[in-house]
Amino acid sequence: MLKIEGLVLASSSKYRLALLEQIGVVPGEVVSPNIDESLLKGELPRRYCMRMARTKADAEAALRSDKFVLGADTVAYCGKRVLSKTESEDCAVRYLEMLSGRRHRVCTSVCLRSPGGIVHERSVVSVVKFKSMSKGEIEYYISSGQWRGKAGGYGIQGFAGALISWIQGSYSSIAGLPLHETYCLLGGYFDLKHIP
């Protein structure tokens, strides 16, 4: 593992930190940015996702101008409809019923801001298809509490992974951090080649 003292992860997601550790990187600091995550009128899902990643990085860079700041955001969406982070059981049930037997997209955007103010951004869009879920499967998933705070009402890392028929794209991106793209962004500034 390479602990990078000059790197701040601007995310409240424990999964993002664990994913970052999978590529051998431990940030010097992990912070939960306090930002407005409201969707703008007419804003498309991918643009919204990138704006959120950039806003997280910008908010923390303003407080830590001498550090590299990595912000990320994940958005699930059907068509142009953003399936926001779920905070209520009713919302999670509605999302899962809507996603049952259907495909939808998941976008994760990453923004790396350097101490000099240089901004690097990447977005990865993947397709996810849920099996046709029974009422019992949805109820079991809801009772697990794994839907809380998750885009689209689910996290692929937990029991929901058993309900997903297939994905097209990046598993790590669906989980919250596209590892290849993040590795490439960080590798532009830090020597990551020695990490096994």
Curated annotation (Swiss-Prot):
Class in the EC hierarchy, top level: hydrolase
Presence of keyword Hydrolase: yes
Protein keywords: Cytoplasm, Hydrolase, Nucleotide metabolism
Protein name per the record: Nucleoside triphosphate pyrophosphatase
UniProt entry tagged with the keyword rRNA processing: no
GO cellular component term, pick one: cytoplasm
One GO BP annotation of this record: nucleotide metabolic process
Lineage summary: Bacteria, Pseudomonadati, Pseudomonadota, Alphaproteobacteria, Rickettsiales
Catalytic-site annotation from UniProt: D73
GO molecular function list: nucleoside triphosphate diphosphatase activity
Subcellular location: Cytoplasm
Function comment: Nucleoside triphosphate pyrophosphatase. May have a dual role in cell division arrest and in preventing the incorporation of modified nucleotides into cellular nucleic acids.
Cofactor: a divalent metal cation
